[in-house]
């Protein structure tokens, strides 16, 4: 403040957000001639011509207890870190918060931003509250420091996709286009906790082997315009005028509303729609756009059949219309709902209905019951994956039952399915919320892709989830054991020296109290009388006196599939526990193993014969 010494000044705190409840805490302002003992907001910047692929940033982790549980306001800057900006042509094109290492000894890992869009151009990197030594470690590079070890580390999954660095949460924008599976996710490239909402991006031709690309959507101003969750689809008929067969992403921009970005080059680049938002957060907007408060748009194409009445002549010409299902809390969280909008051009939307009792990260799709295309049913769910089945007429969803059903359990949240998948497949991926090892350069996991189907059960129509058939391509060695009785004192044992495998077990629990599948790093207990998996009391009924359990084990996590997909459970595993055998024990009686089949799986990052 030295340049204003002797002059009057005023500190003004302005809250311009009217959309939802909130408050600002601003206190303890002090004037002093003594520099405080924390890093001041001194600015460092460097202008350079882009000649390499990445701009890398030295990151220093805080202990997880501090990162996740700070309470003292003075710790806030320690947790949030420092603003970091990339500027091009005088404009901020990337804006993040990062906890930069203050010297080389403090570096835990390096974050990276792609410079591909600025090749040969002059850009400026700028940061505040960093030391000169720390800022000097921000450099151009053709690789990420430590990249030679990625996907080979002892703590990282081998057949579940993980981003190279940074944090992930919700899957986003999942779409199949011209032979390529496009997968996006909520990504914090600068930290191992949530924030800096960016859309990470990877593609695959087989749902197994993934190539990570530069991010697709970025925050670009200070503290707002974060790229929250959304979806992807293909505009086959060019209804929006973005181009035939364009990939179109819908996302929540936290400052303005629901927005669009599109690609005409197969996902190599995405352009934001110039008239964003298409649904506004500004209740004073006079453009005629719909207003709401919420997030996470899901957009699907609703194709007409003979019973449908088209929205208008344009919809009749195209043979259908677009439907947006979006989390809405315009009237408060106590009235949260899934809100349905319709459109013929993706740009202009009309509110049609609300389905109360649903919240963020919603999904809507149609599936045949027992594979019968003449007997389809609609499914709807939100972030917790609890779902309802019913009818949808293009405007309103009508559940055919009270309440919701549950398929997914454990560390599983915010799942999404691939739009436009071939043969009508519904391939689902969820955010596996289990954390990575403290020494890892990434945090968060993605579930293994699984296929959803509908089936007529005795209780009604229910959904199942099973790992995609493509997993068979990862098998390298197989082991079998069958027709073995086992007890507590005489367990059934299968020697196995692998931390990555696909196990299928069928057993008759008989008069036992419990059957225990003992895999080093985890125990799966089946309680016979209660007919449930003990962990979180997951129901799993006997079928003809038998239980079938499939387990995907992968270094630091595992997934349980019960009775051919009737339950799907995601859980963490202690990666330090090496597996040398699988053991089956029975408590309180004798059980019979009818079949145990184990397939060791190779890493999805092994492309060659070795």
Spans of features found by a protein language model:
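Extracellular carbohydrate recognition and processing domains
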Residues: 1-9, 14-21, 36-41, 58-60, ...
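Beta-rich accessory regions
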Residues: 22-23, 33, 39-58, 63-90, ...
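Structural motif
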Residues: 134, 196-198, 256-261, 333-339, ...
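Entry beta-strands of beta-propeller and related beta-repeat scaffolds
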Residues: 180-183, 240-249, 318-324, 372-379, ...
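Short glycine/acidic-enriched loop and turn motifs that connect beta-strands
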Residues: 188-192, 254-256, 329-332, 435-436
């Amino acid at each position: 403040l030295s340049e204003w010494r002797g002059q009057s000044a005023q500190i003004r705190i302005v809250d311009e957000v009217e959309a939802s409840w909130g408050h600002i805490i601003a206190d303890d302002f002090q004037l002093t001639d003594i520099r405080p003992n924390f890093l001041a907001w001194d600015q460092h910047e460097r202008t350079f011509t882009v000649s390499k692929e990445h701009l890398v940033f030295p990151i220093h982790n805080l202990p997880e207890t501090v990162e996740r549980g700070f309470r003292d306001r003075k710790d806030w800057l320690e947790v949030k870190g420092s603003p970091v900006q990339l500027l091009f042509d005088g404009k901020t094109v990337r804006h993040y918060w990062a906890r930069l290492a203050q010297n080389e000894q403090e570096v835990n890992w390096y974050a990276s931003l792609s410079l591909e869009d600025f090749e040969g151009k002059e850009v400026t990197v700028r940061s505040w509250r960093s030391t000169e030594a720390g800022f000097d470690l921000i450099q151009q590079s053709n690789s990420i420091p430590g990249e030679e070890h990625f996907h080979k580390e002892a703590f990282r999954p081998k057949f579940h996709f993980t981003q190279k660095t940074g944090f992930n949460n919700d899957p986003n924008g999942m779409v199949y286009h011209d032979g390529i599976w496009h997968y996006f996710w909520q990504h914090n490239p600068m930290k191992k906790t949530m924030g800096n909402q960016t859309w990470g991006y990877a593609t695959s031709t087989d749902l197994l082997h993934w190539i990570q690309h530069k991010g697709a959507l970025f925050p670009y101003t200070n503290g707002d315009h974060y790229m929250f969750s959304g979806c992807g689809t293909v505009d086959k008929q060019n209804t929006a005028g973005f181009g035939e067969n364009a990939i179109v992403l819908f996302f929540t921009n936290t400052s303005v509303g629901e927005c669009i970005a599109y690609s005409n080059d197969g996902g190599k680049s995405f352009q934001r729609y110039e008239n964003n938002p298409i649904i506004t957060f500004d209740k004073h907007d006079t453009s005629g756009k719909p207003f709401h408060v919420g997030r996470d748009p899901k957009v699907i194409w609703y194709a007409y059949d003979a019973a449908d009445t088209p929205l208008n002549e344009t919809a009749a010409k195209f043979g259908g219309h677009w439907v947006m299902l979006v989390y809405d809390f315009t009237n408060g969280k106590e009235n949260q709902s899934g809100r349905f909008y319709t459109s013929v051009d993706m740009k202009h939307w009309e509110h049609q209905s609300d389905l109360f009792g649903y919240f963020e990260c919603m999904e809507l799709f149609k599936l045949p019951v027992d594979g019968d295309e003449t007997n389809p049913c609609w499914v709807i769910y939100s972030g917790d994956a609890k779902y309802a089945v019913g009818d949808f007429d293009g405007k309103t969803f009508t559940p055919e039952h009270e309440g919701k059903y549950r398929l997914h359990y454990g560390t599983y949240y915010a799942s999404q399915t691939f739009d436009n998948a071939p043969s009508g497949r519904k391939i689902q991926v969820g955010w596996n919320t289990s954390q990575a090892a403290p020494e890892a350069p990434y945090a968060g996991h993605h579930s293994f892709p699984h296929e959803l189907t509908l089936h007529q059960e005795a209780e009604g129509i229910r959904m199942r989830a099973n790992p995609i058939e493509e997993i068979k391509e990862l098998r390298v060695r197989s082991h079998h054991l069958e027709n073995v009785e086992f007890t507590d004192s005489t367990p059934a044992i299968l020697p196995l020296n692998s931390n990555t495998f696909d196990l299928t077990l069928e057993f008759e629990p008989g008069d036992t109290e419990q059957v225990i599948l003992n895999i080093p790093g985890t125990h799966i207990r089946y309680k016979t009388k209660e007919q449930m998996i003990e962990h979180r009391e997951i129901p799993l009924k006997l079928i003809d006196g038998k239980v079938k359990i499939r387990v995907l084990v992968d270094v630091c996590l595992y997934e349980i599939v019960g009775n051919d997909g009737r339950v799907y459970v995601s859980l963490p595993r202690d990666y330090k526990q090496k597996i040398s055998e699988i053991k089956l024990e029975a408590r309180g009686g004798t059980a019979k193993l009818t079949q145990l089949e184990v397939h060791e799986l190779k890493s999805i990052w092994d492309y060659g014969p070795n």
